[in-house]
Amino acid sequence: DRSLQPEEPHGIVLMLPANTSKSRTYAHLRDNGQLGAIINASEINTMVSALSQDYGRQDDVYCAAAHHEDISSSFKVDGLPIFVREPRLGMCLTGTPDQFVALVRTLENGLYSRLGILTAPAKWVWHSAAPKEGQIENRAYFRELGGEVLGMHEMLLESPTEVVFTAAQWEEHSRRFESCLDGVVIEGCDSPGAIVVRHGLYAMRLAAVLT
């Protein structure tokens, strides 16, 4: 039957480029399944450039993936509808304050409250680029670290781990974030409330990862 077509193979792509179309992001998250994906970008502007294009407007996807909420799309170009159950997507971005403002234009679009933000002052110290005996090349160094992370990942696949908070830890968690939320209520602004609530969740996630 010539009408039958072979099924297109779907590869697993764990490292998604920051400049990826919305439809491709859907497809990658679907194909990766529980492994999920991560976006690494040394320049926030790379993602800003994609989000400013018609093909790359996917703030909603990032917001949904932060809470593993099911996402779906149906476009003629994609053929059958795409459904992604409990998408898992992480992002690690670096950039200047101006680049960050270009990415998160307002506190009310939901993306800001879903980000963990780390700021640090610049420490200007000159590091000579001259080669030194016994010096480790950066790429080789991070390749070695990558091998260690891969080993940890493979170990956890064979030995699933569940992190459980004690009653005292739950009490401390609730006390701290309830205090933060009370401060927001006093200010009379709604947007920071979402930041406090979501960061209460992220504190638990970080505790699980560090454990």
Roles of regions detected by a PLM:
Residues A64, S73-R88, V101-T211:
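Phosphate-sensing "switch" segment of ASCE/P-loop ATPases
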Residues D1-A102:
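Conserved ASCE/P-loop NTPase catalytic core
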